[in-house]
Design a protein with these regions (language model features):
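Multi-pass alpha-helical transmembrane bundle typical of ion/small-solute transporters
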Residues: 1-341
């Protein structure tokens, strides 16, 4: 086995590690509300989310994978060291923010780290501006859209069930929240499941294992082991690390009842369905946080713990530049030992 093959295997394993930490960090968003409302136990919620994350891989196509793999940086100017540095940089940032209990975006950590390593190797000219434009716009738009939809849905539910007995409403939405949690998990899988595949395709192209033509046409033809491995890694990550972020998302921002959980998840799911179809790698964290804030604000503004929300916003702002710096430092370290990297 030659060095190039070993390096590709290491890259794929790191990509699966990133998926694990994505589950560790991001997939908890899929179950935060259904757990905080006590509709499902954390363990059952993880299984529920994992099933629909897996199904999503076959529903939404690979538009997001194409954006991540070929739409953010010029792949003709990167190397295997860039891909490795990007993956490790994203993982390091995810571990740090998980430890701090901050629900930042693994998606934005990945693209920030990937870009940071690419810039460290080839300068700012390696960036593809139009690929970044829609992503940066939706850093702002996604949580606002989630918040507006959450506010609208919650207001509508209050009006529709204004004369119903609270215990009957609670019982109904405990059942409906299983559907909304499934829908949100589908949206999460549709946006996140393809990101690692895009990175793997970029790594194969950077190492010359696939041609430019194969790289540009490979998005609909990923092998089953890659799909299964990516989803399994994400599910395991959710199982082992999800609750720390679930606690912040589901209870520290605002108190939720089943009706609120249903509205937040539905608002988040609609946002994720739309962006996945458009190939925009939005943050599931940003989306569900905005939806939870929108739902909580229908009670009264003081129902939202704005101090916690403010810390989350600062984490959002820092994610892309911080992960980029971490990855750039890693790349420069590699280049110190291997000037041709």
């Amino acid at each position: 086995m030659d060095n190039a093959t070993i390096l590709v295997i290491v890259t794929i394993l790191l990509a699966l590690c990133f998926d694990f930490f994505n589950g560790f960090h991001d997939a908890a968003n899929s179950i935060a509300t259904v757990v905080s409302t006590r509709v499902l136990s954390p363990r059952l919620a993880v299984v529920w989310a994992a099933i629909f994350n897996f199904i999503a891989a076959f529903i939404f196509g690979t538009a997001v994978a194409k954006t991540i793999g070929a739409g953010m940086v010029d792949v003709n100017r990167i190397s295997q060291a860039v891909v490795l540095s990007g993956l490790v940089g994203a993982i390091v940032w995810d571990i740090l923010t998980w430890w701090w209990g901050l629900p930042t975006s693994s998606s934005h950590a990945l693209i920030g780290a990937y870009a940071g390593a690419a810039i460290a190797r080839a300068g700012f000219g390696v960036i593809i501006p139009h690929g970044w434009t829609k992503t940066l716009i939706f850093i702002v738009v996604a949580p606002i859209l989630g918040m507006i939809l959450g506010l609208i849905f919650m207001t509508a539910m209050f009006w529709i069930f204004r004369n119903s007995a609270p215990q009957n409403v609670d019982a109904l939405f405990r059942r409906l929240q299983l559907l909304s949690a499934a829908a949100y998990s589908l949206g999460h899988g549709g946006n996140d499941a393809q990101k690692t595949m895009g990175i793997i395709a970029g790594a194969l192209y950077a190492d010359g294992i696939i041609t430019k033509h194969e790289f540009s046409t490979t998005w609909g033809h990923f092998h089953w082991p890659i799909i299964l491995g990516a989803n399994l890694a994400m599910g395991l990550g959710t199982y082992f690390g999800g609750w720390r972020i679930v606690h912040t998302m589901g209870s520290k921002i605002t108190k939720l009842k089943p009706i609120g959980g249903f509205c937040a998840e539905t608002a988040g799911a609609i946002t994720l369905f739309t962006t996945a179809a458009a190939g925009i790698p939005v943050s599931t964290t940003h989306t569900i946080t905005g939806a939870i804030v929108g739902v909580g604000s229908t009670q009264r503004l003081s129902a939202v713990r704005w101090g916690v929300a403010g810390k989350i916003v600062w984490a959002w702002i820092l994610t892309i530049p911080a992960s980029a710096l971490v990855a750039a430092a890693l790349f420069w370290t590699i280049r110190w030992f291997n000037p041709s990297a």
